[in-house]
Design a protein with these regions (language model features):
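Long, C-terminal-biased catalytic regions of enzyme "large/alpha" subunits
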Residues: 1-192
Length: 192
């Protein structure tokens, strides 16, 4: 289904004409100047643009198989890394098949985390550590309910981008007011 959705997006973009966005297509923002009747697909083929597969709920998947405190379990961590690698490998195969760059994007998806969790709770009921918190965890992020320190969060999450975030990733930490302690942020920055 993910492949079908991404291919659908590619097909929709191919319907655009240079006149739809002249700055992008006619005036060179994409590195070429097309006439208003040219096919925009030539700008995206040969992996010149990316169509990305995002994901949520890796924490919840591991919780089903290993329990909700799986973060320190090496087998569970390897399992989740294998999931990310499998998504990356699928995207690489689709790139070869279609000659577009398909990638895995590990990023927050705030509106979907709530919506999908709500829909699943309606269908499957409230499940401890899965739907009871009313959201799914973004991509590979550490469970925020556990209040990890920025250092713990960075240490836990560091393997995931390399495992498969070919389309990029967003790493974030939440901090209290840093105006009184800018050195704390600098320490985290240096650690990262």
């Amino acid at each position: 289904i993910a492949k079908d959705a991404l291919v659908y997006r590619v097909e929709r973009v191919k319907e655009a004409t240079p006149a739809n966005a002249p700055i992008l297509y006619q005036y060179g923002a994409f590195g070429q100047r097309l006439s208003k009747f040219d096919n925009v697909d030539q700008l995206f083929k040969h992996r010149r643009a990316t169509v990305s597969l995002g994901y949520i709920g890796l924490y919840e998947v591991a919780s089903v198989f290993y329990g909700s405190d799986w973060e320190t379990n090496p087998e569970a961590k390897a399992f989740t890394l294998d999931i990310v690698k499998s998504m990356k490998n699928a995207c690489e195969g689709w790139s070869d098949e279609y000659d577009y760059h398909f990638s895995v994007y590990s990023t927050p998806s705030e509106s979907l985390t709530d919506r999908f969790c709500r829909l699943d709770a309606e269908k499957f009921g409230v499940v401890t550590d899965i739907t009871d918190k009313e959201y799914y965890t973004n991509s590979f992020h550490y469970d925020v309910r556990k209040n990890p320190t920025p250092f713990e969060k960075l240490e836990f999450e560091k393997a995931y981008p390399e495992a498969g975030a070919t389309g990029g990733f967003i790493h974030y930490c939440e901090y209290p007011v840093l105006q009184q302690n800018p050195k704390a942020l600098e320490a985290v920055w240096d650690f990262a």
